[in-house]
């Protein structure tokens, strides 16, 4: 009997079962994160661990609709390289690696792919991977960041003003999922240089995009107030993220793939490749 209808983990299927999953047109989820410093109190796997945990819970709830790939655990991290343990991947390497994954699953016949990001600096890269996948295959590829789905709930319970890195948000999620790994006695509050239009970590909520070497402005590796993190908050925002992604999966699975129409009235040079 095939496990395709009940198994949500891509790498747990056999190749004959993969044929069944393709026939079901399961949506493929690719979690992405990073391996980088997260202060004195959190492990360096924060971004990939949190993102993968959210994606796996989505899979557990709707196993007949999705397959979750093993995550991409490394990302664009040179700005954190002054802190031991951080692994940096150059943007072109990351994009090409991710594109090889999405094109592989498209080649096998999966028509819908969702890249879920867990690391702010990867956002423009996964956007490009998704766009290139659509242009270079017959599948549709979407890109999102899981924490967009929890911010509404988090804003109701947050006690800190800055949400950025190793902060109240990430600390709360990690406390909920694996509290034994969090060293809360070492949690601190720390902030970057902030102006009206730009900050040292302008990846969100600023008019100007800018990210400085973190070794220039922090000795802790924290941006925000980690001391406000609690497992109770983490449970609330984890549920919000999972529920949001489940709703997104349902919408994307129903999204049509229409046939392209060529509007030219004169011959085109179809041999040109980009």
Each model region followed by its residue ranges:
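Extended, histidine- and acidic-residue-enriched regions that form the cofactor-binding/catalytic faces
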Residues: 1-114, 120-274
């Amino acid at each position: 009997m095939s496990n395709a209808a009940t198994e949500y983990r891509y790498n747990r299927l056999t190749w004959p079962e993969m044929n069944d999953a393709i026939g079901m047109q399961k949506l493929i989820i690719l979690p992405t994160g990073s391996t980088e410093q997260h202060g004195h109190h959190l492990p360096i796997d924060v971004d990939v661990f949190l993102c993968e945990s959210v994606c796996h819970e989505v899979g557990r709830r709707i196993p007949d609709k999705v397959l979750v790939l093993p995550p991409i655990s490394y990302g664009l991290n040179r700005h954190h390289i002054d802190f031991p343990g951080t692994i940096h991947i150059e943007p072109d390497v990351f994009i090409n690696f991710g594109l090889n994954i999405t094109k592989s699953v498209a080649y096998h016949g999966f028509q819908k792919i969702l890249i879920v990001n867990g690391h702010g600096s990867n956002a423009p890269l996964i956007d490009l991977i998704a766009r290139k996948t659509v242009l270079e295959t017959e599948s549709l590829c979407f890109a999102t960041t899981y924490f967009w789905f929890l911010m509404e709930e988090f804003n109701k319970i947050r006690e800190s003003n800055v949400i950025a890195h190793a902060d109240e948000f990430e600390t709360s999620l990690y406390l909920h999922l694996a509290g034994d790994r969090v060293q809360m006695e070492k949690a601190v509050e720390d902030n970057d240089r902030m102006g009206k239009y730009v900050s040292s970590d302008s990846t969100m909520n600023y008019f100007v995009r800018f990210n400085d070497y973190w070794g220039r402005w922090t000795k802790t590796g924290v941006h925000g107030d980690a001391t406000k993190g609690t497992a109770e908050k983490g449970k609330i925002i984890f549920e919000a993220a999972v529920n949001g992604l489940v709703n997104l999966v349902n919408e994307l699975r129903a999204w049509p793939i229409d046939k392209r129409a060529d509007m030219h009235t004169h011959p085109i040079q179809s041999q040109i490749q980009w």
